[in-house]
Amino acid sequence: MNNIVIVGLQWGDEGKGKIVDYLSENADVVVRFQGGNNAGHTIVIDDEVYKLNLLPSAVLRADKISIIGNGVALDSHALVSEIESLKVKGVDVNYNNLMVSESCPLILSVHKDKEKLFEDLNGNHKIGTTNKGIGPCYEDKVGRRAIRLCDLENTDELNQRVDALLSYHNAIRKGLNYQVVKKEEILKEIQEISEKILLYKKPVWKILNDFMKEGKKIIFEGAQGAFLDIDHGTYPFVTSSNTVASQAITGSGLSYNAQIIGVAKAYTTRVGNGPFPTEQNNEIGDSLFSIGKELGTVSNRRRRCGWFDAVLVRQAVQLSGVSSIVLTKLDILDSFDTIKIGTGYKYGGKMYDYLPASHSIQKELEPIYEEFPGWKEKTQGKRSVKELPANLMKYVRKIEELIGVPIHLISTSPNREDVIKLKNL
């Protein structure tokens, strides 16, 4: 099958960037279809670390085409800065190998202001956003007042769009005794970047359909993870877009038949606030944090850490129609005597084999665990199944049994080549 969708099965930070980079060697095109520069994908090539926020992970391969779809909230200044920082490292990003949908809604300073303002107003009930303006940008898109990339080409249209945008944002700012924004300030902000960003503007949906007819191999690269999905995640502690596989169609404009691959860590992490049934607020969590170097790529915040939650991952598999799994960061568990997997929940005298939608229940769930002996052997950098300890493989097989789909790849380090194939795609 020519098309592959890659999605995260937890709360993000599963290692999707490395897997997209690895699989893109045999692809032609990689498409980002949701989120914004609140996502962070880290790729290590020959000990050089690349941290990507908006750009698809295939941008590091010179012969691949990278596309930012209409489902992405676009911070134009951040994109140009990311392109320029890659050029310093010898990576050439140009309008031949990068295309941006003309329908992308633009993130502006008013969006970042609003997000920070409302996070501050929430006090102890903060969501824990990255303050990148993603949520308010999506709000404006749904409210039909967003400024889109295509609007930058027409002065009259742009002026009308800015008027509509500011009538809303300034009404809120006045109500909260916050300084209003002048139209000239927004126009200047846009004009500073428009010439550079318009070089990449394309009718992405049409180009993707042409590519599909030509038989090109396309990878759709998801950001965040299933339980940050606005509909299916741990609401309200979620992101502002759909992160499950079906969003790849809406966020790119391409209807496709595709293999859907999920990426999951061998344990669980989460950045920010919200329910986390298998979280370990103890020495185990501290060890996972320190060994796994669990700091957010974008926020640089400490990630909360816990045991693998098979209930969550199985639910994510079903939500996205995942047919196979990539399991990452198994090497982080090398030193543990005992390893646990969450296999169910208890609440109010009732057993759950799924994550209930209610936040009031989610935050009180008590995990049910199954224990496994650790392998106490270094696996970092291994590239062959024969090199893997028997107890590690028992752990992998149990996860397969619990989530109901096969694990076909294992990642044993951040490096591009440290991947073990268990099954063919």
Curated annotation (Swiss-Prot):
Positions contributing to substrate binding: T297, V298, S299, N300, R301, R302, R303
InterPro entries: Adenylosuccin_syn_GTP-bd (IPR018220), Adenylosuccin_syn_Lys_AS (IPR033128), Adenylosuccinate_synth_dom1 (IPR042109), Adenylosuccinate_synth_dom2 (IPR042110), Adenylosuccinate_synth_dom3 (IPR042111), Adenylosuccinate_synthetase (IPR001114), P-loop_NTPase (IPR027417)
Any single biological process term in GO: 'de novo' AMP biosynthetic process
Residues that, per the record, bind Mg(2+): D13, G40
Binding site for GTP: 12-18, 40-42, 303, 329-331, 411-413
Protein EC: 6.3.4.4
Pfam families: Adenylsucc_synt
Pathway in which the depicted protein is active: Purine metabolism; AMP biosynthesis via de novo pathway; AMP from IMP: step 1/2
SMART domains cross-referenced by the UniProt entry: Adenylsucc_synt
Record field: catalytic activity: IMP + L-aspartate + GTP = N(6)-(1,2-dicarboxyethyl)-AMP + GDP + phosphate + 2 H(+)
Residues forming the catalytic site: D13 (proton acceptor), H41 (proton donor)
Record note on cofactor: Binds 1 Mg(2+) ion per subunit.
Cofactor(s), names only, from the UniProt record: Mg(2+)
Enzyme class: ligase
Residues that bind IMP: D13, E14, G15, K16, N38, A39, G40, H41, T130, R144, Q224, T239, R301
Keyword annotations: Cytoplasm, GTP-binding, Ligase, Magnesium, Metal-binding, Nucleotide-binding, Purine biosynthesis
GO terms assigned for molecular function: adenylosuccinate synthase activity; GTP binding; magnesium ion binding
Main location: cytoplasm
Compartment annotation: Cytoplasm
Any one cellular-component term (Gene Ontology): cytoplasm
Family, per entry: Belongs to the adenylosuccinate synthetase family.
Subunit annotation: Homodimer.
Biological function: Plays an important role in the de novo pathway of purine nucleotide biosynthesis. Catalyzes the first committed step in the biosynthesis of AMP from IMP.
Protein name per its UniProtKB record: Adenylosuccinate synthetase
Species for this entry: Wolbachia pipientis subsp. Culex pipiens (strain wPip)
